[in-house]
Amino acid sequence: METAIVAAASAIGAGIAVATGIGAGIGQGIAAAKAAEAVGNQPEAKGDITSTLLLGVAIAESSAIYGLVISIILLFVNPFFKYLGM
């Protein structure tokens, strides 16, 4: 019984961890839209805008990657099963 509860909680936790990708996707979309708007307003600043955009997108993507790593750990290398003797 405890094994089923731990497995279900791990699956729910993995789903919540993957949901961090939603926030990252929305943030990246907004950032790209604002960057395109800024390049349209000031084409001469394209290099600065692009480098700032890429740095911001990389930081936003890191939360999605961390969520993916946590979900993979919970699903395939579940550390909670060792406490149940499995």
Curated annotation (Swiss-Prot):
Keyword Transport: yes
Family to which the UniProt record says this protein belongs: Belongs to the ATPase C chain family.
GO molecular function: lipid binding; proton-transporting ATP synthase activity, rotational mechanism
Cellular component GO terms held in the UniProt record: plasma membrane; proton-transporting ATP synthase complex; proton-transporting two-sector ATPase complex, proton-transporting domain
Residue spans crossing the bilayer: 4-24, 57-77
Gene giving rise to this polypeptide: atpE
UniProt site positions, description: Reversibly protonated during proton transport: E61
Organism the protein comes from: Clostridioides difficile (strain 630)
Quaternary organization: F-type ATPases have 2 components, F(1) - the catalytic core - and F(0) - the membrane proton channel. F(1) has five subunits: alpha(3), beta(3), gamma(1), delta(1), epsilon(1). F(0) has three main subunits: a(1), b(2) and c(10-14). The alpha and beta chains form an alternating ring which encloses part of the gamma chain. F(1) is attached to F(0) by a central stalk formed by the gamma and epsilon chains, while a peripheral stalk is formed by the delta and b chains.
Source species taxonomy: Bacteria, Bacillati, Bacillota, Clostridia, Peptostreptococcales
Keywords noted in UniProt: ATP synthesis, Cell membrane, CF(0), Hydrogen ion transport, Ion transport, Lipid-binding, Membrane, Transmembrane, Transmembrane helix, Transport
Protein known as: ATP synthase subunit c
InterPro entries, sorted: ATP_synth_csu_bac/chlpt, ATP_synth_F0_csu, ATPase_proteolipid_c-like_dom, F/V-ATP_Csub_sf
Any matching Pfam family: ATP-synt_C
Bilayer disposition of the protein: Multi-pass membrane protein
Protein localization: Cell membrane
Known function: F(1)F(0) ATP synthase produces ATP from ADP in the presence of a proton or sodium gradient. F-type ATPases consist of two structural domains, F(1) containing the extramembraneous catalytic core and F(0) containing the membrane proton channel, linked together by a central stalk and a peripheral stalk. During catalysis, ATP synthesis in the catalytic domain of F(1) is coupled via a rotary mechanism of the central stalk subunits to proton translocation. Key component of the F(0) channel; it plays a direct role in translocation across the membrane. A homomeric c-ring of between 10-14 subunits forms the central stalk rotor element with the F(1) delta and epsilon subunits.
